[in-house]
Amino acid sequence: MIFNLEDNTLNDKYKLMAQTIIPRPIAWVVTEDEGVINIAPFSYFIGLSSNPATVLISVGHKSDGTAKDTLANIRKNKKCTICMVDKANLDKMHFSSKELAHNSSEASEYNIETTRVFELFPPMIESVPCAYFCDFNQEIDLGGGDTIPLVLNVRKIYVKDENIVDKERISIEFDPVARIGKSYASLGEELVAPKMP
């Protein structure tokens, strides 16, 4: 079956892509404005390059058509902290996807503990295994639509000591949660690559 995306509705496009581009890592993004901490998850999230270290997140709009707080805060303050989600944080991450009023904080609403590691960046979520401290690189204009891709420079990376199994080789292990359609999944069995012929 062929789906013509020029004819399909926006909801159809999302359903098709969200269920076939899988699994998708989740960026649990922390931003801050005038003392209010905003936390929201985004699964349109990829690493663009390790040199220069850059990632991309795509941020939509609120139900009333205005910019989500994450987008507004990054546009204004040029900073964010991206936390990687593991199974232990699944519930609170999911709850933080609910739309709140602009001056409300998911941190207080859902009892999400944060800790400030660097003064120049928003705090990270205390319980996560890994966090990226980022600043704004550029916004990509897709020529309309409801989603705004943001390219972010990764300036510092935090990894919990207990998740670094080999410090010399920088070998890191944790149990990430991925997005598949409207559901979540863990990675499960690790597959070993076959030897090249």
Predicted regions and their residues:
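Basic, polyanion-binding surface patches
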Residues: 1-197
